[in-house]
Every structure is written in structure tokens, then in C-alpha cells.
A protein has these predicted regions:
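A short C-terminal boundary segment appended to hydrolase-like catalytic domains
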Residues: 38-89
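Residues that line or immediately flank small-molecule/substrate-binding pockets and catalytic motifs
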Residues: 1-2, 82
């Protein structure tokens, strides 16, 4: 899987808000949010890392906002959001 948000946000026919992949929250200039140099060296040297270090670049946060009917719990409205980092809207 890619950790990249998909653009298929919608409400399904029975009222469920849906998006295939919300995306990764964190620094996209990284290895799934971890320091890329450490992760690459671990892969190349086949070393078991005792500790992972988070990437310290600008983070991206992405997700969806769902408005639901209080009585049924069904989705009335759904919209994507992306803030910060390299995937800015």
C-alpha cells in the first residue's frame, strides 16, 4: 500500500462514508514517518535496529470529516482534508 490519500471519498448507497486510503500522517520525506537514512542503512546492512527515529521534517496530516445523522448514525456529508507538508491542498 502507498500511504497516499485516494480521491474516492463518497457516501455509499446505505449511508456509510468511505475513502479507500486516508493517507499517512507525518513527514512524507521519510520512510513511513521514520528517519530515512537510518531506515535505508538498516535495510542495506540487514541490521536489526534497536530504535527507530522519527523524521523531523514538516508533517502532513490528512483525513476525512464526516457529518452524521444523530438519530441514524448514517453519513450526511463527507469531505477530505490535507494540511501541511508536501501534499498541501
Amino acid at each position: 500500500h502507498t500511504h497516499v490519500p485516494t480521491a474516492d471519498t463518497r457516501i455509499l448507497s446505505n449511508g456509510t462514508a468511505y475513502q479507500t486510503d486516508i493517507g499517512m500522517c507525518g513527514d512524507y520525506d521519510s520512510v513511513i514517518g521514520m528517519n530515512k537514512e537510518n531506515s535505508i542503512m538498516k535495510f542495506l546492512k540487514n541490521k536489526d535496529a534497536k530504535q527507530h527515529f522519527p523524521a523531523l521534517g514538516e508533517a502532513t496530516i490528512s483525513g476525512i470529516i464526516v457529518e452524521a445523522d444523530d438519530s441514524t448514525g448514517l453519513s450526511l456529508k463527507v469531505e477530505r482534508f490535507i494540511s501541511g507538508g508536501i501534499l498541501k491542498n
